[in-house]
A protein has these predicted regions:
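Short, conserved loop/helix-junction motifs that constitute active-site signature segments
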Residues: 19-24, 208-214, 252-253
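Gly/lys/ser-thr-rich phosphate-binding loops in alpha/beta enzymes
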Residues: 1-49
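Short internal beta-strands
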Residues: 27-31, 215-222, 257-262
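Short, flexible loop segments at boundaries between secondary-structure elements
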Residues: 33-34, 214-229, 275-276
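Active-site glycine-rich loop that binds ribose-phosphate moieties when present
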Residues: 161-180
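Electropositive, gly/pro-rich neighborhoods at or near active sites that engage anionic ligands
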Residues: 30-165
Length: 297
């Protein structure tokens, strides 16, 4: 199974799927449009969250970073007058250093990610959507800014006018992504932000066309027409769709099986189940329910 993932909602589902599927039966293609260089290191926030989840390292309170991590380096950088916009943990920074050293030597992001996965003991395939540079830029009431600046530094507070993915027109799907699209029959679009997490993956050249030949299952990230986390509602409105399951489906396009929460008022064709995943048992229940639905469809 191929899973398309962002960095918060879908890892909660992966927490369950990894317990139910053999490693060779689970591959994850991850959004890279929120990647950026900070303090001399290349950060791939969504890839890192997926890797940490599969390696049982994720901080499940925040769904980013490593559990129990400290921020001694970040704190001392602030003391030195360095305006490091992200509160990077010390162990998390080690991941960034590992990746950045490889990238500076000319290694592609795909191979750097494979090396990181191996070092962490992750057996599942984790593949970036592209090896090219794509950046999510948000036009807001306070100016144009990188998505991480909007969401982390400004807590998603500015009004959003539009969302643009710079570099997307020139970017190509990674070779690993293309290989999985050829091999896998089922594609699961995880419950991540449909605009900034899943949107860039689907917008890569040829991806939507290839998905038409697959069994595509999508889990809405909304519960009761509200995102569980993140600024999805603002971003969906700026993209011209309502912050609802109907809006999610419109953004995702071709779907064979659309799964929404039991509380949803969506009236289109769908399957309903409890999709809120606050605990590992809830992640297991959702994962098991999805696998049953897929096998029966």
């Amino acid at each position: 199974m191929l899973v398309l993932s962002g960095g918060t909602g879908t890892p909660k589902l992966l927490r369950g799927l990894k317990e139910l599927l053999p490693p060779n039966d689970l591959a994850v293609v991850v959004n890279t449009a929120e990647d950026l260089w900070i303090s001399g290191n290349y950060i791939s926030p969504d890839i890192d969250s997926v890797l940490y989840t599969l390696a049982d390292l994720i901080d499940e309170k925040k769904w980013w970073g490593i559990k129990g991590d400290k921020t001694l380096t970040h704190d001392f950088l602030l003391t030195l007058g360095v305006d490091e916009k992200l509160n990077v943990g010390d162990k998390d920074r080690a991941t960034h250093i590992f990746r950045s050293n490889l990238l500076r030597r000319g290694v592609k992001l795909s191979l750097a990610t494979e090396a990181l996965a191996g070092a962490m003991g992750v057996e599942q395939k984790v593949i970036p959507m592209t090896d090219d540079i794509v950046s999510t830029v948000v036009a807001t009431s306070e100016g144009v800014m990188h998505f991480q600046d909007f969401w982390v530094s400004r807590h998603g507070e500015p009004d959003v006018r539009s969302v643009v993915f710079t570099g997307l027109e020139e970017a190509l799907p990674s070779l690993g992504f293309l290989s999985l699209l050829e091999k896998e029959d089922t594609v699961l679009i995880g419950p991540s932000n449909p605009v900034t997490s899943i949107g860039p993956i689907l917008a890569l050249p040829g991806v939507r066309e290839r998905l038409r030949d697959k069994k595509v299952v999508a889990v809405s990230p909304l519960v009761g027409n509200r995102p569980v986390s993140g600024p999805a509602a603002k971003l969906m409105a700026a993209s011209g769709v309502p912050a609802s399951d109907e809006g999610v489906r419109d953004l995702l396009g071709h779907i064979d099986l659309f799964v929404v929460d039991k509380k949803s008022d969506y009236r289109g064709e769908c399957k309903r189940m409890k999709t809120l995943m606050r605990t590992k048992n809830e992640s297991l229940a959702v994962a098991r329910g999805l696998l049953d639905m897929i096998s029966c469809s």
